[in-house]
Amino acid sequence: QYDFSFFEYWASDYAGHKQDMPWAIKQLEVFDGVLKGLLTNWNMENDLVLLTSDHGNMEDLGTRKHTAAHVPLLLFGAKTNRDAFTDVSDLTGVTPAMSSLLGL
């Protein structure tokens, strides 16, 4: 039993920098399968899955650089856990909200 687990899917980041749309789409399809498996087996009544990114770049394959695109903050799980992120408006708010949720 763990209180916190972190997973980074670097392949989508690499796909954006590679500027290869068919390969980028394949990476998103692979991640969709991983996420589906996770959410299908997740305890939604007690736990939380947080999905976000630190930058965009796959939406604009005309550049290899990070873009300023707004990225989503998706939360799956118990409403009481999701409520800890109500005031999060950008990436800098994720760590304080997570720390509060974990009682740190």
Language-model features: where?
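Feature captures the catalytic ectodomains and active-site-proximal regions of enzymes
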Residues: 1-104
